[in-house]
Curated annotation (Swiss-Prot):
Reaction equation(s) it catalyzes: (2R,3S)-3-isopropylmalate + NAD(+) = 4-methyl-2-oxopentanoate + CO2 + NADH
A GO MF label: NAD binding
Positions of the record's site feature: Important for catalysis: Y144, K193
Subunit field text: Homodimer.
Protein's recorded name: 3-isopropylmalate dehydrogenase
Residues that coordinate or bind Mg(2+): D226, D251, D255
Cofactor binding mode and count: Binds 1 Mg(2+) or Mn(2+) ion per subunit.
Species, as recorded: Sordaria macrospora
GO cellular component: cytosol
Pathway in which the depicted protein is active: Amino-acid biosynthesis; L-leucine biosynthesis; L-leucine from 3-methyl-2-oxobutanoate: step 3/4
Length: 368
């Protein structure tokens, strides 16, 4: 029987609360789907919690455990008590973790966990119904990692955006793999600013080369990022498929997309360090896209669905358990369809109520 080693970072504020519900899901799979194997969970501190205890947002011990693991599950990090002016900040731990694990591809799905949530969207139901795409953001290159010059009092500052062909090729291959795994294969949308930026022109050329030569059966379309941002509001279904873009553009467009499903608490993410083809280890960091929510943490009202769906992504991409991943997603849909909703969705269910409802539906599905 397989044993899956998972490092768990509860993180700060509401992070541990939502992780508890995600772990309930893993325990249910162990019990009700024995062929999935065992989940060996190792708890470590990250972010502010680690600063408070170790004066370090990510210790060497925690980092080494994450490197050796099959996957990493994270709640959320950060909070006002650690400030933004401090030399040691919670976010430094997550950035270091991403860098050391080489997680170059960030995946954020944009869809409705349940059709009943369409009316929760700020967009009209007839506009957003049927939206289903995944943003694949290059995570370890671009302007966030380029040379910068801080303002030294002269009133001048500078950031540079470097990209190499190799960096673009590997994120294009990841997007191509994900698109090809869909049934039927999904369309690939590549977002850039090739009418202005040199890096975008290299991006467009490289993505075209990779998709046309390595994934000839896929349909590829290029879209300027500003046009795509407008399309996302006007007709988000037009981007259905796999959306690939650079670090900066992906950061912005994925946050814009996160508004569509109606609550940031619903949305999962995965940061991968390889192609999840089942042929070798593909470690990843799995976390909800929401922050640590210090204003509502400890009240039992945080929505754990984003974290639970992050577990589904972990099962699919790092642990090669697609049946169980599908079951978790179906259980979330069933729980919401049956009326279990947290406060952010207009309901009264607690964090624990939501987790328990998903587990109850999951048990039915796995035993069927």
């Amino acid at each position: 029987m397989a044993t899956h080693n998972i490092v768990v970072f509860g993180g700060d504020h509401c992070g541990p609360e939502v992780v508890v519900e995600a772990i309930k899901v893993l325990k249910s799979i162990e019990t009700n789907s024995p062929s999935a194997g065992k989940f060996n969970l190792q708890n470590h501190l990250l972010g502010g919690a680690s600063i408070d205890k170790h004066h370090d947002p990510l210790t060497d011990e925690a980092l080494n455990a994450a490197k050796a693991a099959d996957a990493v599950l994270l709640g959320a990090i950060g909070g006002p008590e650690w400030g933004t002016s401090s030399t040691v900040r919670p976010e430094q731990g997550l950035l270091k973790l991403r860098k050391e694990l080489g997680t170059y591809g960030n995946l954020r799905p944009c869809n409705f966990a349940s059709e009943s949530l369409v009316d929760s969207s700020p967009l009209k139901a007839e506009v957003c119904r049927g939206t289903d795409f995944i943003v694949v953001r290059e995570l370890t290159g671009g302007i966030y990692f380029g040379d910068r010059t801080e303002d030294d009092g002269s009133g001048y500052a500078c950031d540079t955006e470097p990209y190499s062909r190799a960096e673009i090729e590997r994120i294009a291959r990841l997007a191509g793999f994900l698109a090809l795994a869909k049934n039927p294969p999904a369309k690939v949308w590549s977002l850039d600013k090739a009418n202005v930026l040199a890096t975008s022109r290299l991006w467009r050329k490289t993505v075209t080369d990779v998709i046309s030569k390595e994934f000839p059966q896929l349909q590829l379309e290029h879209q300027l990022i500003d046009s795509a941002a407008m399309l996302l509001v006007k007709n988000p279904r037009a981007l259905n498929g796999v959306v690939i873009t650079s670090n900066l553009f992906g950061d912005i467009i994925s946050d814009e997309a996160s508004v569509i499903p109606g609550s940031i608490g619903l949305l999962p993410s995965a940061s991968l360090g390889g192609i999840p083809d089942g042929k070798g280890k593909c470690n990843g960091i799995y976390e909800p896209i929401h922050g640590s929510a210090p204003d509502i943490s400890g009240k039992g009202i945080v929505n754990p669905v984003g974290t639970i769906l992050s577990v589904a992504m972990m099962l699919r991409y790092s642990l090669n358990l697609p049946k169980e991943a599908d079951a978790v997603e179906a259980a979330v849909k069933a729980a919401i369809d049956n009326g279990t909703k947290t406060k952010d969705l207009g309901g009264s269910a607690t964090t624990s109520d939501m987790g328990n409802a998903v587990v109850a539906e999951l048990e039915k599905i796995l035993k069927a």
